[in-house]
Amino acid sequence: VIKNLKKIDSLLLAQVKEVTLDFSESMHSIVKACFPNAMITLDRFHHQQFCLEAVQEVRIAFRREEMTRVANEREEFRLMLKSFAEKGEAPTDKEGNPVRLNAAYHPEKLENDETRAEILARSKYLLMMSPNKWTDTQKKRAAILFREYPEIEKAFSLSHSLRMIFSQRCSKENGQKSLKKWYKEVGEYGNKAFNDIAAAMYDKEDEILNYFVNRSTNAAAESLNAKIKQFRAQLRGIIDRNFFLFRLTRIYA
């Protein structure tokens, strides 16, 4: 990439004022080598995506625990019925209510008629959204989820607060103050995934904060990349690369 970019007149390369990119070290090296006067801005959506993934990790961990708990309780219920049958006694549940010998185990349901495993599974997408975009059903589900799992609420709060930091229009200095508060909250939470994200952001903080200068993102490049991939998939492969590039320039340039 550097070799091909160097074919462009150095005066033109020097006119580039800003480049947005992700956390890729290779892309960082390319920009440093080819665009000496460009300000590097790390795309805000990439570190926000890392936070969303960290929230999902917390949710999935709780769901796995719940699935294990339900499986254990189902087995205990089966063994209890078997024990009553062997003794020739009428089975009863923990509250003393009569139970059939062939009864199936049903996990406890919450007030929205979902089990804990179900609410953990169905909360995936609401945890990726801003609360102001939730439907009434999602609002009710979120309230129950956060009440039952405060750790998920804290993880979501950290992810959402980072989104809000980059949604505000402020100076680079004020953005830095907000980020420092966010680092502190992450440290108090003590989750490894969030700690890793905060450490990576702290290491590249100046380039992340450059977003507040022009509010530039990678959105246009990501959109074009998606269109090119879709176009390539429709062709079911490329035989003549030069002709493919010619078609791309005619369609998208």
PLM region descriptions:
Residues 52-64:
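Short, surface-exposed amphipathic charged segments that create phosphate/polyanion-binding patches used
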Residues 2-7, 11-35, 45, 49, ...:
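Acidic/histidine-rich catalytic cores and adjacent linkers
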